[in-house]
Each structure stands twice: as structure tokens, then as C-alpha cells.
UniProtKB/Swiss-Prot annotation, chain A:
Belongs to the TRAPP small subunits family. BET3 subfamily. GO terms for cellular component: cis-Golgi network membrane; cytosol; endoplasmic reticulum; TRAPP complex. Pfam families: TRAPP. InterPro entries: Bet3, NO_sig/Golgi_transp_ligand-bd, TRAPP_component. Keywords: Endoplasmic reticulum, ER-Golgi transport, Golgi apparatus, Transport. One of its GO terms (biological process) is endoplasmic reticulum to Golgi vesicle-mediated transport. The lineage of its organism: Eukaryota, Amoebozoa, Evosea, Eumycetozoa, Dictyostelia. It is found in: Golgi apparatus, cis-Golgi network; Endoplasmic reticulum. The keyword Acyltransferase does not apply. This is Trafficking protein particle complex subunit 3. May play a role in vesicular transport from endoplasmic reticulum to Golgi. Its main location: Golgi. Homodimer. Part of the multisubunit TRAPP (transport protein particle) complex.
């Protein structure tokens, strides 16, 4: 399954329109700097980044499904592989890996090797382990998965900006949402 | 003439990088990056710490550089007419790509070739999906509009953000370029290399008055307005906030070249944007 999605990820990334990643990195950096100035509390910055990511994710999933041609995933394990091999590859051009499943198969860790958001970035010591610089990625994943009826919770457990060796996001499946009959049709 | 203006800018960048969270161009930052291209990128990053004179082609650390005796006029000429200089530059780019291929493995050659073709005159760099950036851009504009007390303050913020990004981005893009002897060369760089990097096309029209202090740049299909739809019932029909950031980009880029300027813009019809650059002096 992993190889199949690896190939699909590469194919889709080669097809999509691409742009210089430095523009993205620098723009994101300028925005984070602005948010830190606007909000006194670093925790508020994290929340704001996650909220922005959520709003991006609910739109991004449409693009993802249209371009990748992926249908419904059979289970959460397949969903995780699709996110790592196709989703991250398609949009960011990076490889991500899935690991550390729990016994119930409802929790996994996503390792991002080469996060383009943190090129050129240094964190001063007072922000390490407090500011989750790439927290927008957690919001994107939550928003996107909610649009395909999976309610998840994403948090950064490791970040290379805080002197860890890799960036890791913990993803916990909280519930599978059921369809609601539209108002007036029941 | 431009040297005294350029040096303080570079020093400011270095100092700023040590006091707050922001993007820092330099060897230290590169050391933290997990980029696969680090062995290739690091020497270029290091050169950013040197004085403006050292940023010329003669001192470039790229061993296969073919521009040792070129000046910016030849460089720009090579862009307009793909002659020998342009071809040589492409050769250099392809050679650089080849150096990277060993690190990236077999799956990447096609991608690298695309990268070379997309940006034949700029430093090799990573690519991401354009839609990814556009989703982010829309959300960023929305966030800043909501968090500001009024529209004017929002536009000031966007202009300031754009200035920061433009200032740094153009530093990356002009690593391989000799210093511009004239103002017109700097504006041409914005119209060609900078615009291609950000919008994947060159500016459609460039006009100037005879004194040379005012430039009018016309983009007939502005990329960041392409996907906006028109809602006739909306109270706010003004989409200038989506363009204000770009005005800041231009101002920041020109500032890094040593020219302080005022950039205004006008949205003329669907997707046509006109940017006016007025040099302060």
C-alpha cells in the first residue's frame, strides 16, 4: 500500500502547478512574526495558527480530491498513508512517514522530514517548546479530515525548531461523523 | 553610489535575525534546516553575509558560473533574447541540478528538469504546489482584515508584511546577479525574474516617464485575483486588499536594491492591475 501511494504522490506532484517554496516560507514567517506582535500570549498564536489552518483545510480537501483522484479510504490506517504519501507530497513536496500506531489503531505519529515552512527560521530560546511554529499544518489536517467525516485532534509533539531531531505530529481519531439529513428533507 | 545604501541593509538583516522570531538568511539558519539541498544551498547562504560587493558574479561560489565577465545589461539581454549567454546560464543550471540529483534519487530527475525550465535564470530552489500557497494567501488576507480595527490599518499591515517578504525574497533571487548600475535595470529585474518567481509570468507592460523616476507596471492577468468570483449582492466590492500585499513586495524588493520608493496600484478591470512605482529622492 505504501509504494502505491508513494508513486501516486510523485505523479500528482509532477502534474500540479508549482511555485517557489521560498515565497511561501517567507510569507508564512512574516505572518507568524505579525501574530506574535498582535497577541501577547504565545498560546493564542498557536490557537490562531491552528484556526487559520482549519479554514485552509476545509478548502484544500476539495483540491486534493479533485487532483489526486483518490476515493473513500477503507479505514484510518489507509487514511494515514494517503495523508503522508499523497497529501504532503502533493502540496508541500515533502515526504512524511506514519508510525507509532497505538493498539486501537486510532492514534498515529506523522514524521515530517523536510518541512518547507521552517527553512531560514530560528526561534529564540523563550519561544522554544512554547510556539508551535508549523501549527497551521495541524489545523489543515483537522479541517480537511473533518470534511471527509473524520474528527481528529492533531498536536505537535516534536519540532526541529525546538532542537528535536524531527518534526512529529500526533493524530488522534476522536470519532467518525455520521451523515445528517438536510433540514426539511426528513 | 549604491554601495553605501546596500551595506546598512545587509547589516540590519543580520542584526534582526538574532533578536526575534523571523526568517534569517544565513549559514546559521541553513544549519538548522533539514533541506535535502543543504550541501548546495549553504555556500550561497554564506555569501549573503558578505558585503554588497561580494554579491557580484565574480565572487560567486558556484564553480560552473559563466557570468564572470558579464554585467547586468548582458544578463538582462540574455533574458530578452535567448542567445549564447542565456544558453550558457541554462547549462549552468542543469549542471547544478545534476549535482543535486545524487542526493534526491532517481524519482526526481523529471522534477529537476521542470524546475530548471520554470525558472531558468534564478537560483535553484524547492517547489511547492501553487494552490497550497494560494489557499494560504487567501486565509492570511482574511485573518489580517479581521484582526485590524479598520481597513486602512489592515492595508498598512499588509503593505508591511509584503515589504518584509519582498525584501528577503529578492535577496535570494539576486544571488547570482551582478549589481544593477541603473534604476531601470532594477525595475526590469522586478518585471522579469521577480514576477516570474511569484506569479509564473513576466509583467505585461512597463512604461516610464522621460525623467525616469516613475514606472508603471501593468499585469493584465493578475494571478491572485484570478480565482475571485463576483457577488453582485455583496456590500464590499473592493478587492484591493488582495493586491496591497504585492505593492509591499515591490517596495521591499526595490528597497533591497537601494531605491526607496512609493508603490500604488489600480485595479482597472477584471484581473488587470497597474502598479505605479515612484522613486523617492
Amino acid at each position: 500500500m505504501s509504494k502505491k501511494y508513494d508513486k501516486l504522490g510523485n505523479d500528482v506532484f509532477n502534474k500540479v502547478e508549482k511555485i517557489n517554496s521560498e515565497l511561501f516560507t517567507l510569507t508564512y514567517g512574516a505572518l507568524v512574526t505579525q501574530l506574535i506582535k498582535d497577541y501577547e500570549d504565545i498560546e493564542q498564536v498557536n490557537i490562531k495558527l491552528e484556526q487559520m489552518g482549519y479554514n485552509i483545510g476545509i478548502r484544500l480537501i476539495e483540491e486534493f480530491l479533485a487532483k489526486s483522484g483518490i476515493g473513500r479510504c477503507s479505514d484510518f490506517i489507509e487514511t494515514a498513508e494517503v495523508i503522508a504519501k499523497v497529501g504532503f507530497k502533493m502540496f508541500l513536496g515533502v515526504n512524511a512517514h506514519v508510525g507509532d500506531w497505538d493498539a486501537n489503531r486510532k492514534e498515529f505519529h506523522l514524521t515530517i522530514e523536510d518541512n518547507p515552512l521552517i527553512d531560514f527560521v530560528e526561534l529564540p530560546d523563550q519561544y522554544k517548546h512554547k510556539l508551535y511554529y508549523s501549527n497551521i499544518l495541524c489545523g489543515v489536517m483537522r479541517g480537511a479530515l473533518e470534511m471527509v467525516q473524520m474528527k481528529v485532534k492533531c498536536t505537535f509533539v516534536k519540532c526541529t525548531l525546538s532542537d528535536d531531531s524531527t518534526s512529529e505530529i500526533k493524530v488522534v481519531l476522536e470519532e467518525v461523523l455520521s451523515d445528517m439529513i438536510p433540514v426539511g428533507y426528513d | 553610489m549604491s554601495d553605501p545604501l546596500s551595506n546598512p541593509t545587509i547589516n540590519t538583516t543580520n542584526v534582526g535575525g538574532q533578536t526575534t522570531t523571523q526568517n534569517t538568511i544565513g549559514g546559521v539558519g541553513g544549519g538548522k534546516s533539514n533541506s535535502v539541498g543543504t550541501p548546495y544551498t549553504t555556500p550561497l547562504q554564506t555569501s549573503a553575509y558578505t558585503t554588497a560587493n561580494s554579491l557580484s558574479a565574480t565572487n560567486s561560489p558556484i564553480p560552473n558560473h559563466h557570468m564572470i565577465n558579464s554585467n547586468s545589461s548582458n544578463n538582462l539581454s540574455g533574458m530578452v533574447t535567448p542567445g549564447g549567454a542565456g544558453l550558457q546560464q541554462q547549462q549552468s543550471s542543469i549542471t547544478s541540478s545534476t549535482n543535486n540529483l545524487g542526493l534526491l534519487g532517481q524519482q526526481q530527475p523529471q522534477q529537476q528538469q521542470q524546475q530548471t525550465l520554470l525558472q531558468p535564470f534564478t537560483t535553484q530552489s524547492r517547489l511547492i504546489s501553487a494552490s497550497c500557497f494560494e489557499f494560504f494567501y487567501i486565509e492570511m488576507i482574511d485573518c489580517i482584515m479581521k484582526s485590524s480595527s479598520d481597513k486602512q490599518q489592515a492595508h498598512k499591515k499588509l503593505d508591511k508584511l509584503g515589504f518584509k517578504v519582498g525584501h528577503r525574497l529578492v535577496e535570494r533571487l539576486s544571488l547570482d546577479t551582478a549589481l544593477f548600475p541603473e534604476l531601470l535595470d532594477a525595475v526590469k529585474f522586478i518585471c522579469k525574474v521577480f514576477w516570474t518567481t511569484v506569479f509564473k509570468k513576466t509583467i505585461d507592460g512597463l512604461k516610464t516617464n522621460h525623467k525616469g523616476g516613475v514606472f508603471v507596471l501593468t499585469d493584465s492577468k493578475f494571478q491572485w485575483l484570478q480565482h475571485l468570483s463576483f457577488d453582485s449582492s455583496a456590500s464590499n466590492k473592493d478587492c484591493s486588499e488582495y493586491v496591497q500585499f504585492t505593492a509591499g513586495l515591490i517596495k521591499g524588493a526595490m528597497s533591497n536594491f537601494g531605491f526607496k520608493c512609493i508603490v500604488t496600484f489600480d485595479i482597472q478591470q477584471v484581473s488587470t492591475c497597474v502598479f505605479t512605482i515612484k522613486i523617492e529622492s
